[in-house]
């Protein structure tokens, strides 16, 4: 779609569907200038991704409630819409009309700024999530690095809201969130670095393209099993999901940094945490599970069926399967995250930091070194 | 050197063990997903309170002799017995009687000691109110009988404790239409009636008739 930076897509992958080009061509057919067509096009993918993110959150909340219920031999939401699908919508509506409370001796400005600072980077990170060769807002050259740097803005917001609440539980929750995010960012970045080293690019599109050669066999999970585990554990810690939900541990800290929040500000935290979960799942599928790639390469399928990859219908089907595959993989991971939530007990803060600094960090370093060695030894298999 | 290697080996073994345990745990939670729900869908389904359930207290004004035993045995002297001495008949005349269920602990001592059995326990437990003073029941309110779970047409009565049908051990894939184990009070009554009819005709067949009635109930 919109490409601010030059894409260096490998020549062997077909350019696929380019909606922006077709759209601009249509508008230019109406006599608009190139610039005007671009200006009209710009907000469309952004809006689309924003809506997709919010719908993704609604689905995730519903899934979380239904799967949690099933794991505990309950039924879960049932009466709001068929099978309770409208329950998250009802929850959101409730939060929207609730009173907006700022505690008496809290810092009003920071208290308001906190949730915004938590949500904005997470939504901004959707910029780099590809659903197809050209189906992303911006193929930024530094793609995955942008996500890592954006996700380190989040703890500042958490710390801010925890400190501004003028509440000891909030402060402790905020501090824990900051400590957790900082200690898990490093192994996360190292795990990503190993993938980046193999695909020779930080761009998410290139990372996926590099995994599309032989379908499921070329997915990074086979070449980076340790990296996959490190990334998934760190992603769970970054999302503050159980077993790493210390910042909001109900039994100890009421609700952590969210304690004093109500109404729309609380909804922002809630939205942020679930968007972050979906985003992390999407990025795991992009980095390790072949992104939009079908288990069998679409090019092969088209070849067996005697169709050209460039035929319009094939392109549309390829695009659709791309979106479905990305979402499917992401939601499989979301399911695992929800199941893990009811399987694992919460770790203690010392165990959390131990795991981060003494286990994941050395392991990620070793993984990086081994990847580098393998890349030098077998450049064919490890993207030399 | 070997010490270091041993450390690394132990560490690896621990990590592998942790992974195995985690997988085992995930298998357990995954296995729970397709089981029959244990929950009672409350406003639509209700558990039948047990026989000697201590719910809201029922009181019969006409039986009461204003002896105030209930007040004496009550841990906090809760019942308010408002009576006056009629000088002419030399008898107590009861005016009002009330119990505040916002304070009552439902110990049942008053019911136990009432000499005329004018106090009794009901199976009513839905005592939520917007104002705690509305829980102070006077003799009129105390005389009302609650709607029974088994006769309320809006409620599906459920037997307590067992959530699986009789004879079922595996909670997986149980048909949702099959009821829980145990008979509902009306089924118990009908089987008793059948039993009585069978025993009047033939003493020897009473056992089989019990069996058939049980079978039909399930």
Swiss-Prot record, chain B:
SUPFAM superfamilies: 4Fe-4S ferredoxins (SSF54862)
UniProt keyword Cell membrane present: no
Coiled-coil region list: none
Cofactor(s) the record lists: [4Fe-4S] cluster
Feature: compositional bias, Polar residues: 208-218
Enzyme's top EC category: translocase
Subunit structure: NDH-1 is composed of at least 11 different subunits.
Stored PANTHER family: NAD(P)H-QUINONE OXIDOREDUCTASE SUBUNIT I, CHLOROPLASTIC
Name of this protein: NAD(P)H-quinone oxidoreductase subunit I
Species of origin: Synechococcus sp. (strain WH7803)
Gene coding for it: ndhI
């Amino acid at each position: 779609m919109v490409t601010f930076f030059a894409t260096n897509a490998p020549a062997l992958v077909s350019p696929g569907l380019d909606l922006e080009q077709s759209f601009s061509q249509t508008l230019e057919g109406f006599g608009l200038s190139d610039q005007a067509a671009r200006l009209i096009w710009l907000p469309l993918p952004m809006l689309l991704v924003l809506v997709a993110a919010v719908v993704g959150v609604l689905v995730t909340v519903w899934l979380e409630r239904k799967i949690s219920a099933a794991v505990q031999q309950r039924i879960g939401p049932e009466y709001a819409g068929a099978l309770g699908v409208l329950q998250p919508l009802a929850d959101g509506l409730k939060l929207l009309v609730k009173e907006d409370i700022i505690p008496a001796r809290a810092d009003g400005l920071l208290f308001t700024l906190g949730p915004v600072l938590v949500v904005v980077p997470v939504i901004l990170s959707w910029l780099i999530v590809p659903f197809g060769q050209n189906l992303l807002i911006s193929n930024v050259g530094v793609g995955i690095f942008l996500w890592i740097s954006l996700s380190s803005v989040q703890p500042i917001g958490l710390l801010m809201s925890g400190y501004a609440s003028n509440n000891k539980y909030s402060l402790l929750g905020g501090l824990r969130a900051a400590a957790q995010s900082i200690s898990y960012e490093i192994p996360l970045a190292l795990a990503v670095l190993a993938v980046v080293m193999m695909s020779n690019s930080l761009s998410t599109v290139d990372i996926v393209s590099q995994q599309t050669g032989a379908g499921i066999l070329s997915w990074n999970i086979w070449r980076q099993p340790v990296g996959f585990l490190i990334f998934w554990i760190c992603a769970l810690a970054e999302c503050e999901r159980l077993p790493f939900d210390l910042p909001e541990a109900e039994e100890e800290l009421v609700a952590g940094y969210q304690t004093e929040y109500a109404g729309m500000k609380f909804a922002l935290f809630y939205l942020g945490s679930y968007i972050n979960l979906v985003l992390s799942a999407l990025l795991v599928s992009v980095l390790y599970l072949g992104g939009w790639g079908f288990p069998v390469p679409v090019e092969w399928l088209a070849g067996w069926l005697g169709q050209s990859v460039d035929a319009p219908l094939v392109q549309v089907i390829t695009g659709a399967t791309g979106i479905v595959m990305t979402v499917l993989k992401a939601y499989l991971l979301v399911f695992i995250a929800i199941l893990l939530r009811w399987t694992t007990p919460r770790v203690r803060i010392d165990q959390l930091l131990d795991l981060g600094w003494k286990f994941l960090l050395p392991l990620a370093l070793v993984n990086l070194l081994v990847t580098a060695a393998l890349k030098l030894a077998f450049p064919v298999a490890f993207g030399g | 050197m070997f010490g270091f290697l041993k450390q690394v080996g132990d560490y690896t073994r621990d990590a592998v063990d942790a992974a195995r345990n985690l997988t085992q745990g995930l298998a357990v939670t995954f296995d729970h997903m397709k089981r029959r729900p244990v929950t009672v869908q409350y406003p639509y389904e209700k558990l039948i309170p047990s026989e000697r359930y201590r719910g809201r207290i029922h009181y019969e004004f006409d039986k009461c002799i204003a002896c105030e035993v209930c007040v004496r045995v009550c841990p906090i002297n809760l019942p308010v017995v408002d009576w006056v001495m009629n000088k002419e008949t030399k008898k107590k005349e009861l005016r009002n009687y009330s119990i505040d269920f916002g304070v009552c602990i439902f110990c049942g001592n008053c019911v136990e000691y009432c000499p005329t059995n004018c106090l009794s326990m009901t199976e009513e437990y839905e005592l939520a109110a917007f104002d705690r003073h509305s829980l102070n029941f006077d003799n009129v309110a105390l005389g009302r009988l609650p709607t029974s779970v088994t006769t309320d047409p809006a409620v599906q009565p459920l037997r307590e404790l067992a959530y699986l049908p009789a004879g079922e051990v595996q909670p997986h894939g149980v048909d949702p239409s099959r009821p829980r184990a145990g008979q509902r009070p009306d089924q118990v009554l009908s089987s008793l009636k059948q039993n009585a009819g069978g025993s009047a005709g033939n003493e020897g067949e009473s056992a089989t008739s019990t069996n058939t009635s049980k079978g039909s109930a399930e």
